[in-house]
Amino acid sequence: MLNLVNLFIFFPILLFLHCFFIFLFKKWLGPFGTFYSSLLVFLTSLILTLNELYFILLYGEYFFIDFGRWFFCLDLIDSHLVFCVDSLSLIASALVLTLTSLALYFGIEYMYREAFINRLLYLLNLFATSVIFLFFCYDFFLILISWECIGLFSFLLVNFYSMRIYTIKAALKTFVFSRISDLFMFFTFILSILVFNTTDLSLIFLQVPFFSFHYLFIGNVAVHFLTLFSFCLSTSGVIKAAQFFFHVWLPDAMEAPTPASALIHSSTLVVAGIFLVIRFSTLFEFTVLTNYYLALLGAATLSFSSVTAIFQNDIKKLVAYSTISQIGYLVCGCGFCCYEEVLIYLIIHALNKAFLFILVGYTVHFFNGNTDMRQMGGFYIYSFDIAVLFLGVCLNLAGLPYSAGFFGKEFLLYQLLRDDFLSLIVRSCWLVSFFFTPVYMFILIFVVIYGPKKGLINTYYDFWSFKWVHEYYLLILKGNMLSKNTNLKSVNHQNHLTTYAFQFTIATCRTTTYILVTFWCFFIFFGETFFSIIFNFSTLTDSINSDFFFLFKTHTVFFMNSSSQFLGDYLFSFILFFSTCSFIFLLNLKFTLNYKYLTHLWILDLIFMITTLGLLWSTSTWSYIPFILITTLYFLKFNR
C-alpha cells in the first residue's frame, strides 16, 4: 500500500516531467506523438487515481506526506513540499484527468489541420498539470504558485489565435481578471504569514478555532480576522468561477479553441475555484458573513445569467452564460455550507458541460465555423446521433426529472427549506433560474438541432485510419444506385447529404460518440447512486458542524428500497428512455445509408416504431411475439 501511495504521490511530478519531455521532443513527436504520449500518461494517472480512491473510500484514510523544506525567507515563509491525498483531492483529480483525456482526443481530431496544434496540446497538458498540483498541495505557498500557473496558462490558451483583434481583447480581459483574483489570493497568503505564522494548511486549520474572536485593527476600525481571511479567499475563487460582477471575461474567453473551452471554461477552471472553497470549509464554518456573501452572490449570478443567456445569438456565448449560471448554484451551495451536495453537482455539471462544449464544437465546425444560431438549423438531418446526444445533455442540464441534473439540484434546493429572510431571497432567485434554464436549453435544441435548415455545411473529411469504412459504404451506395440504372454523376449529386451524413457520423465522431454515450447514460441514470459514496470525504481536520447557518441534511433519495414506488418509476423511465435512444440510433443507421431526409420513412419503419413503443407500455408477454416478428422483417429488409 505504501509503495502505491508513493507512486501516486509522484504522479503530478510525472505529469510535469511529461510536459518537459514533449517540449524537448515536440519536433520529433509531432501532433500524433504528443497526443498519444499525453493520453497514455493521463490515462495511467487516472487508473492510479481511481485505485487509490477505492482504498481511501474503503478504509476512510488519508495520506499526508512532507518532502521537507524547499523555500525559506527571513523567518516569514517556511514552505514545505507538502501533499495531502484524501478523497476530495482524488475525486477532483479523477474528474480533471477524465475530461483532459477527452479534450485531448477531441482537440487532435478537431484541430488537426490548424497551425500550432503542438502548442495547443502542450498548453492543455500544462494547464491540467497545474490544476492537479493545486488539488494535492497542502501548503499555501504551493497553492499560490499553482494558482498563478493556472491563470497564466488559461491566458495563453485564450490568446491562442493571437493574430485576431477580438482574441487579443478577450485575452487582455482574461488577464486583468486573473490578476485581480491573484491579488486577493496573495493578500490571503500575506494574512496567513502575519497571523498564523505558517503556510502549512494543517497548522492553519488547527489554529482556526482559536482565532474565532480575533480582530485586526485598521485605524479605529476593528475587522474580524477570519471573516477578512475567508472573504479574500472566497473572492479569489469566485473571480475564477466568473460570478456576478466578475463574469464579463468568460463569454469573451470563448475566443479560445473549442477543446480549450471544453477543458477550461466548463470544468477545470471552475473546479479549481470551487475546490478552493471546499478545501477551506473548516474556515467557513466560523465566518457567517462570508457565507451570506457567497449565498447572495451565487443567487444573483444564477438568476442574472439565466436571463441573459436567452438573449444571446452566439452559440458559444449562450453556453458560456449557461456555465456562469450553473456555477452560481455551486457558489450558493457553498454559502449554505452544503459542501457534499456542491461536490456532487460539480461533477454532474463538469461532465455534462464538457460534453456540451464538444458537441457545440462539432456543430460549429459543421456550419463552417459560424457561431450565429440564426444561421443554423436542421442539424439532425445530417448527424442524428449527435443531435440525440445534444438533446440528452441539454435535458440533463435543464433538470429533467429522474436525471442526474435533477437530483443534483434537488440536493441543493433542499437546503433552502427554512423560513428565513435570506432563504426567501435566495429562493426567489432560484425560481427565476428554474424557469429560464430550460428555456435557453430548449432554444439551443430547437434552433440549432431541430430547427429549419438555414446555413451551409462543411464537407469535413476524417484523417484517421478508418477511411476504408467510408470508402466501403460509399461503394455500397454507388452499387445500390447503379443497380437501378442511375447515372453515377447524378448519384453523387443526389446523395451528397447522405454521404456527408455518414462521413460525419461514423468517421469524424466515432470514438467520441461512444465515449459520450457511455458517460452520459451512466451519469444521467446511475450517477446519483454512485455519487452517494463520496459524501463523507476525509480531511485532516473534521469539519465543525455549525448552527449559525442552514445545515439540514436528510437525503431521502439515497435511502430508496426496492419496493418503493419511486424506484419503480425511476427504473421504468430508464428503460423507456434507453429503449427509445436505442431505437433512434438504429433508425439513424438506416437513414444514414439510404435516406436524404428523415421524413422519408418506409411503412415497415413506422410499424417497427409503433410496435417498439407499444411494447414498452405493455405488460403482456404476448406482445413480444409481434415485436420479434417485426424486428426480424425489419433487419431482413435492411440487410437485403
Task: Describe the role of every protein-language-model region.
Residues 100-143, 152-505, 525-529:
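Hydrophobic transmembrane alpha-helices and their helix-loop junctions in integral membrane proteins
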Residues 10-27, 238, 242:
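N-terminal signal-anchor/start-transfer transmembrane helix
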Residues 1-9, 21-122, 199-220, 279-281, ...:
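Transmembrane helix-loop-helix hairpins at membrane boundaries of multipass inner-membrane proteins
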Residues 14-20, 42-53, 100-101, 189, ...:
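Hydrophobic core of alpha-helical transmembrane segments in multi-pass integral membrane proteins
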Residues 39-57, 181-192, 391-398, 515-537, ...:
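Hydrophobic alpha-helical membrane-insertion segments
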Residues 1-13, 29-38, 77-95, 133-146, ...:
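Membrane-entry segments of alpha-helical transmembrane domains in multi-pass membrane proteins
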Residues 1-4, 77-85, 212-226, 379-382, ...:
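Juxtamembrane membrane-interface segments at transmembrane-helix boundaries in membrane proteins
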Residues 381-386, 447-633, 640:
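Cytoplasmic/organellar membrane-interface segments at the starts of transmembrane helices
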